[in-house]
């Protein structure tokens, strides 16, 4: 086992604080509308330019192991805030730095660290309650656009794109961000249910100009089996032909004479048919077939539950307004399924999401909810260069997370104002700890709640104390707009923060800062002395002369 280096008390805390400050100072330059960029060197490819706090934090590793421990613990704050709400990483880092700095001063002055932590925790619990009171629901697309704009560093086009996407696919819909091919940002929306399976034969194509199949008001046959014998299909085909409507077959596979007969019937115009494979594999395929059945008011023909193809009637078939199939995808638009049944199915899948343990399962279940409840939107980010593309894509993803958080828990006044109002309310209510040391802990937390506003103002090149006092003197959503350099109602100016982002930033900052304040000893590996080993290996250089031995 390697020898250890151990530091105690103040020596340990000073080193730890130095590491915290190096990381936090690098991250906090990005805060606010006038925050600056940070350039990250990459071992291959061009450097990355970012204004995303967590991306900066992840890059930092310090040479001194004790300082690095401090930096890594604050990095955890940014990561946790990012995981919980997808944004607010810089705010969380600024809060943590302030709590740690003030807390360690109090420890150095002889306060009990455990009581300080208890005081900080009390203040944070009270602040979270105040934030909930200040929160207003975020329901209209204007508010969603404003949240997206603020999170994307005052880029209004991004905010509007996200608001449009949410309007189209609903709050449950899946919105993904991809790299585009042009200079402009684009929004592609797929309404209805889309799955990644294309036509089984190009002979089904009825729109040669687009290479796709379009079926108007089709019947939909869902079969959880391979279909290779056309005899099984005859009763259904005859019934559909009589009804004069097209038929979409979604089965495990359609092959052999069954596929050939369907193609011939389609080409002769006897009955218009298209066949695709069912999406997914194994149990997931069964579940997705059931989703499609719910959406189209059909029944999955499965021998497991005693249903056979020969006995299938028109009542067992699903229906939709329109189906579009191309080489790789199938889209079912406006299924005739009962709304209550669809919502019941969505609730059932949501329950499975809560019980799922792996991220992969959760993601797949979330996709199923989106396909049933809303649709899928793809935001394609446009930029002139690859460096700009990466930076912009990261901003759009951040903004998307922020808008989701806003829809979930509502919004509060942005620009650090909500935390200042929460702190003022706690002071007015006269929150007290069990002893004087806890009271100091409460003061440490309340002072830290001013730090995001102060940092936004510093980054804008203004005097922090003057502006912080002016904002504190106001009430409600009155604050300072660093972008336009004017005071006013933050909500009216469209400067909003998601409540969830502000809450998560404060909770994670206080949690990790509280643990760091109570640290009394730090242990790390001593650096290995490799000099002797290097010299030994270097001495072998003389072996080159052995060539003469040949």
UniProtKB/Swiss-Prot annotation:
EC number: 5.6.1.7
Enzymatic class: isomerase
Cellular component GO terms, alphabetical: cytoplasm
A GO BP entry: protein refolding
Domain of life: Bacteria
InterPro entries: Chaperonin_Cpn60_CS (IPR018370), Cpn60/GroEL (IPR001844), Cpn60/GroEL/TCP-1 (IPR002423), GroEL-like_apical_dom_sf (IPR027409), GROEL-like_equatorial_sf (IPR027413), TCP-1-like_intermed_sf (IPR027410)
Protein localization: Cytoplasm
A molecular function (GO) term: isomerase activity
Self-association and partners: Forms a cylinder of 14 subunits composed of two heptameric rings stacked back-to-back. Interacts with the co-chaperonin GroES.
Function: Together with its co-chaperonin GroES, plays an essential role in assisting protein folding. The GroEL-GroES system forms a nano-cage that allows encapsulation of the non-native substrate proteins and provides a physical environment optimized to promote and accelerate protein folding.
Xref: PANTHER family: 60 KDA HEAT SHOCK PROTEIN, MITOCHONDRIAL (PTHR45633)
Name by which UniProt lists this protein: Chaperonin GroEL
Organism this protein belongs to: Yersinia enterocolitica
């Amino acid at each position: 086992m390697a020898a250890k280096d151990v530091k105690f008390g103040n020596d340990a805390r000073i080193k730890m604080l130095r590491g915290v400050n190096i990381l936090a100072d690098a991250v906090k330059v990005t805060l606010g509308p006038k925050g600056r960029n940070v350039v990250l060197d990459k071992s291959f490819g061009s450097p990355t330019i970012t204004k995303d706090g967590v991306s900066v934090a992840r890059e930092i590793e310090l040479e001194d192991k004790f300082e690095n421990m401090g930096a890594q613990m604050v990095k955890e704050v940014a990561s946790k805030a990012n995981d919980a709400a997808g944004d607010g990483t810089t705010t969380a880092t600024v809060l943590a730095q302030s709590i740690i700095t003030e807390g360690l001063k109090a420890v150095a002055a002889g306060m009990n660290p455990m009581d300080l932590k208890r005081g900080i925790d009390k203040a944070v619990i009270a602040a979270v309650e105040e934030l909930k009171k200040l929160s207003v629901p975020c329901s209209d697309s204007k508010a969603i656009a404003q949240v997206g704009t603020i999170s994307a560093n005052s880029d209004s086009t991004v905010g509007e794109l996200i608001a449009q996407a949410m309007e189209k696919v609903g709050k449950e819909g899946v919105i993904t961000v991809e790299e585009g091919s042009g200079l402009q940002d684009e929004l592609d929306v797929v309404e209805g249910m889309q799955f990644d399976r294309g036509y089984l034969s190009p002979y089904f194509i009825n729109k040669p100009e687009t290479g796709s199949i379009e079926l108007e008001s089709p019947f939909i046959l869902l079969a959880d089996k391979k279909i290779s014998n056309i005899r099984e299909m005859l009763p259904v085909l005859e019934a559909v032909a009589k009804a004069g409507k097209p038929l979409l077959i979604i089965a495990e596979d359609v092959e052999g004479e069954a596929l050939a007969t369907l193609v011939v019937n389609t080409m002769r115009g006897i009955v218009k048919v298209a066949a695709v494979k069912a999406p997914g594999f194994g149990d997931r395929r069964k579940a997705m077939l059931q989703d499609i059945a719910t959406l189209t008011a059909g029944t999955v023909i499965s021998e497991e539950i005693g249903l056979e193809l020969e006995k299938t009637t028109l009542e067992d078939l699903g229906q939709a307004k329109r189906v579009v199939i191309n080489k790789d995808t199938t889209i079912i638009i406006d299924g005739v399924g009962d709304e209550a049944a669809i919502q019941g199915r969505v609730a059932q899948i949501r329950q499975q999401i809560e019980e799922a343990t792996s991220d992969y399962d959760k993601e797949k279940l979330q996709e199923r909810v989106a396909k049933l409840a809303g649709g899928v939107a793809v935001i394609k980010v446009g930029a002139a260069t690859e460096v700009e593309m990466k930076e912009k894509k990261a901003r759009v993803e951040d903004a998307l997370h922020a808008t989701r958080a806003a829809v979930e828990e509502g919004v509060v006044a942005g620009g650090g104002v909500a935390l200042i109002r929460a702190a003022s309310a706690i002071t007015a209510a006269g929150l007290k700890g069990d002893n004087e040391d806890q009271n100091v802990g409460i003061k440490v937390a309340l002072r830290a709640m001013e730090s995001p506003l102060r940092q936004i103002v510093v980054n804008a090149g203004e005097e922090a104390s003057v502006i912080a006092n002016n904002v504190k003197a106001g009430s409600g959503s009155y604050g300072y707009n660093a972008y336009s350099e004017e005071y006013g109602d933050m909500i009216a100016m469209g400067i909003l923060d998601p409540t969830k982002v502000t809450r998560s930033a404060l909770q994670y900052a206080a949690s990790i800062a509280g643990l760091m304040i109570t640290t009394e000893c730090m242990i790390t590996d001593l650096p290995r002395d490799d000099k002797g080993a290097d010299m030994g290996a270097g001495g072998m250089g003389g072996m080159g002369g052995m060539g003469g031995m040949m």
